[in-house]
């Protein structure tokens, strides 16, 4: 089993894939952060910050008196964002923990599900919270990943193969549903959670970028391992570009808890 993050930040379309996810999920993330009552001047950490879209939104929220630490193992998309409010750090959270007791908010989205060391990482994130600080973790649960209208066996076959291929590489497609219990086990209080399945309609020109680009990046491994064949891949891509295809994305489970 791999111990490394599965998806390659150097892949030619990785920024497009990440951007498509930010368009789906950033509004919900910020709505939750506002609900938690993050004040101006707060100290925040965005772990596995990707393109930095949430880090930028946090910087606007906390204002010039606040601080946002944006970390990732590859900071090519983050480096241009560094300024007086946003500090960019190349950091592997599985090896280097955040400073203890420093942050009013720590946020990680679509990260822990990929890490075999997820329980240890979650515990270290909890240690990074200042008293009263919030930890917000958001990951996908694949319970709705094969919901498509009109029904499509090949779409379901490729989606299932993708899920199980990633599982074989250390990904946990059911981790998100355990997050509330994991947050409580980390010694945090005021645990809460919500689950949302976003409906996505196919686009003839763009397809369904979050899922089409995920499968495209994983395609070499899927094909080489016999998880799917070229006919499956071509049919999946065609379905993603049929204008009458409507899917429900995997459940985004957002869980939060506070350090007393």
Give short role names for the model-derived ranges.
Residues 23-40, 57:
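Conserved alpha-helix/loop element of class I SAM-dependent methyltransferases that forms part
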Residues 174, 191-260:
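Conserved Class I S-adenosyl-L-methionine
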Residues 96-105:
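A short acidic, Gly/Pro-enriched loop at the edge of an enzyme's catalytic core
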Residues 119-134:
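A short glycine-rich, Lys/Arg-flanked "PGG" loop and its adjoining helix->strand segment in the class I
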Residues 104-118:
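A short SAM/SAH-binding and catalytic strip from SAM-dependent methyltransferases
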Residues 3-26:
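Class I SAM-dependent methyltransferase Rossmann-like catalytic core
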Residues 136-204:
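Conserved catalytic/acceptor-binding region of the Class I
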Residues 45-96:
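Class I SAM-dependent methyltransferase SAM/SAH-binding core
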